[in-house]
Amino acid sequence: MDRTLVQEILEVVEQAAIASAQLTGLGQKDEADAAAVEAMRKRMGTIQMQGRIVIGEGERDEAPMLYIGEEVGSGTGPGVDFAVDPCEGTNLCANSQRGSMAVLAASDRGGLFNAPDFYMNKLAAPPAAKGKVDIRKTPTENIKILSDCLGIAISDLTIVVMDRARHKNLVSEIRSTGARIQPISDGDVQAAIACGFEGTGTHCLMGIGAAPEGVISAAAMRALGGHFQGQLVYDPAIAQTSEWADYTKEGNIKRLNEMGITDIDKIYEANELASGENVAFAGSGITDGLLFDGVKFEKDCTRTSSLVISTLDQTARFTNTVHIKDGAQSISLK
């Protein structure tokens, strides 16, 4: 993986974001996702690489494109593994709400954890708290550590938690410390990454979300030097989701074992979820969010706002791109 490829993956997420954004607010979440998938797959196909999807839209028999194990790219060049979410926050996009984006993580072959389609308990925090907060500690303990590391009063800390019934006790404990809570309905990748930047108003992400998105968040936080830990959740009583209505704890453990995951309670650090020598993250806003704006359609151009983070040169680049239409007559400065 090289710097040229990092530029290419920026364009991949830009095209996916533009495709989804055309359906923003129309209540068509499946169509928005499909549009992003098709655009992402098409742009990936032009890149000189031997790409492979390790986290995607599902198993081969569940998804027509960007399925797990699918080969993407020209078929020549470096071997690259991808974890993709072409439209993270499909409900957000469908309802024109904040926080939807096209995202992916890339690494050298074998450098991304093949996360099962399970849930994951996550903890994300700023670089100053890396290795000091710990998912094994209670939320109260971690909030006190955050306050000390950041030099911020607990009452001024904001903790992001997904708005789910399973987080009732977590929310109650956080509130008991005096810290603030920002509930989100979907899209915890952007919230996790926001913890890595000062000035976002987001200081920590706690709670359970999707495991595949945890790998994407881990890749970004590793490149930023931030803190990220994840632990797979296999007990339906903890996940509290209708998606597991017919699943049992024992059945889920069996599924994990069949996938080669025998240490089912392992706590994964960012550099284990994204272990490659070279790791990159790319995200482009579909709707406005914590880190960047969504797609803006104008008469003669389309504007995208994106972020690329890479370990190759230890950079985080915020990029505003003007995609000029054929026959454009006038393009405003901003």
UniProtKB/Swiss-Prot annotation:
UniProt catalytic activity: beta-D-fructose 1,6-bisphosphate + H2O = beta-D-fructose 6-phosphate + phosphate; D-sedoheptulose 1,7-bisphosphate + H2O = D-sedoheptulose 7-phosphate + phosphate
Catalytic activity, EC: 3.1.3.11, 3.1.3.37
Keywords: Calvin cycle, Carbohydrate metabolism, Hydrolase, Manganese, Metal-binding
Pfam families documented for this protein: FBPase_glpX
GO CC terms of this entry: cytosol
Listed cofactors: Mn(2+)
Residues that hold Mn(2+) 2 according to the record: D85, E88, E213
This protein's record includes keyword Hydrolase: yes
Residues the entry annotates as binding Mn(2+) 1: D33, E57
Enzyme class: hydrolase
Pathway note: Carbohydrate biosynthesis; Calvin cycle
Gene Ontology biological process terms in this record: fructose 1,6-bisphosphate metabolic process; gluconeogenesis; glycerol metabolic process; reductive pentose-phosphate cycle
Superkingdom as given in the UniProt entry: Bacteria
Binding site for substrate: E88, G89, T90, Y119, R164, A165, R166, D186, G187, D188
One MF annotation (Gene Ontology) recorded for this entry: sedoheptulose-bisphosphatase activity
Function: Catalyzes the hydrolysis of fructose 1,6-bisphosphate (Fru 1,6-P2) and sedoheptulose 1,7-bisphosphate (Sed 1,7-P2) to fructose 6-phosphate and sedoheptulose 7-phosphate, respectively.
Record text on subunit structure and interactions: Homotetramer.
Family the UniProt entry places it in: Belongs to the FBPase class 2 family.
Entry protein name: D-fructose 1,6-bisphosphatase class 2/sedoheptulose 1,7-bisphosphatase
Species this protein is from: Prochlorococcus marinus (strain NATL2A)
